[in-house]
Amino acid sequence: MNYTTQMDAAKRGIVTKEMEIVAKKECMEISKLMNLVATGQVAIPANKNHKSLSPEGVGQDLKTKINVNLGISKDCYNIDAELEKVKKAVEMKAEAIMDLSCYGKTEEFRRKLIDMSPAMIGTVPMYDAIGFYDKELKDITAEELLAVVEKHAKDGVDFMTIHCGINRETAEVFKRNPRLMNLVSRGGSLLFAWMQLNNKENPFYEHFDKVLDICEKYDVTISLGDACRPGCIEDSTDPSQIKELITLGELTKRAWERNVQIIIEGPGHMSLSEIKTNMLLEKKLCHNAPFYVLGPIVTDVAPGYDHITSAIGGAIAASFGADFLCYVTPAEHLRLPNIDDMKEGIIATKIAAHAADIAKGIPGARDWDNKMSRARRDLDWDTMFELAIDPEKAKRYRAESIPEDEHTCTMCGKMCAVRNMNKVMDGKNINILREDD
């Protein structure tokens, strides 16, 4: 193999098997895709050691992708339950799965996940460090943190969230500009605490070249984490968030010089009115690198319904340029999601992604909707169920309330506009009060 990473291959004019697969999935000319990868506008996360991967592209002119978070915690340590979630996420065609395990020895679960998953796999090595070394945060060294990154890369992780942007300068901006919710990024807050406790620079920022060495070796895409993402709408688009974003843009250029692929992570919680501006800022400051957003969650008052607040923000964000949506479940801010929560989160996020693809004019995005509309016009319920984003729920709702006229539903019955227009346009009587002829 005479290239190091997907970006290196693209710059050399080499078509990789991963590029071929992505181009086919996206109905895109391979030459266009290669140019987008070469310029960093598209990333194809594909670790050389992830043998079960079905690669996906993330970025400009591609379908909006979704990520599913799962993993074990101290309070919910059940590997089998998390593996069931993996199966469900794959069944529901999530393009990415992030293992956010934050307790104990996580290697067993991570390796099983990578072995069984065709979806691209992401991790946050910072979460793993405390359990991996069985040390308190303050006592972990910079070298040990980098060793965890290499361990995850060697295991086959396709992309890693690394919070390189919360350096000393960004930390000072944060301290000078108090927030209502401080820092809500788990990995970012751990790094900030490590820096404060040890009076040292962020090791991932200070040793960024060593991070690049590891990622180049295994072709790991760096998902540059946003430690300063807003955790409430009051804190959005503030000096800390913007200072970190500028730093991420600078690190992006350094990574691209080494042919390491980059994804930028973004907010977070913010008002609907700020979403477009934030998408434009990221694309400008980070040189059109792919943008990966958590939500954005557009109101802070809906615990139990944050899959909805997130889907609203995600649809708008993706329509204005976000490329990758992290799902949010109804359990957000409340507890570890169960498999039912996960399904609700996936469906909500897939709806947001698809709605955005229609708005962006992604080729073929409207075809799905047009097929559904034709089935509705024809009152073809079997085809409607086949095309539904959640066939199981659609079938269950219809079965719960059977209409007199099997072609309609119990909302309108024989006053169904579709039924009656079909009949009238065919020159037939609509017969609302009596049996059809």
Swiss-Prot record:
Belongs to the ThiC family. One of its GO terms (biological process) is thiamine biosynthetic process. Catalyzes the synthesis of the hydroxymethylpyrimidine phosphate (HMP-P) moiety of thiamine from aminoimidazole ribotide (AIR) in a radical S-adenosyl-L-methionine (SAM)-dependent reaction. It holds the Pfam family ThiC_Rad_SAM. One of its GO terms (cellular component) is cytosol. [4Fe-4S] cluster binds at residues 409, 412, 416. The keyword 4Fe-4S applies. Substrate binds at residues 69, 98, 127, 163, 185-187, 226-229, 265, 292. Signal peptide: none annotated. This is Phosphomethylpyrimidine synthase. It catalyses: 5-amino-1-(5-phospho-beta-D-ribosyl)imidazole + S-adenosyl-L-methionine = 4-amino-2-methyl-5-(phosphooxymethyl)pyrimidine + CO + 5'-deoxyadenosine + formate + L-methionine + 3 H(+). One of its GO terms (molecular function) is carbon-carbon lyase activity. Its cofactor is [4Fe-4S] cluster. Its EC number is 4.1.99.17. InterPro entries: ThiC (IPR037509), ThiC/Bza_core_dom (IPR038521), ThiC/BzaA/B (IPR002817). Binds 1 [4Fe-4S] cluster per subunit. The cluster is coordinated with 3 cysteines and an exchangeable S-adenosyl-L-methionine. PANTHER family: PHOSPHOMETHYLPYRIMIDINE SYNTHASE, CHLOROPLASTIC, THIAMINE BIOSYNTHESIS PROTEIN THIC. NCBIfam families: PRK13352.1, thiC. Pathway: Cofactor biosynthesis; thiamine diphosphate biosynthesis. Zn(2+) binds at residues 269, 333. Keywords: 4Fe-4S, Iron, Iron-sulfur, Lyase, Metal-binding, S-adenosyl-L-methionine, Thiamine biosynthesis, Zinc.
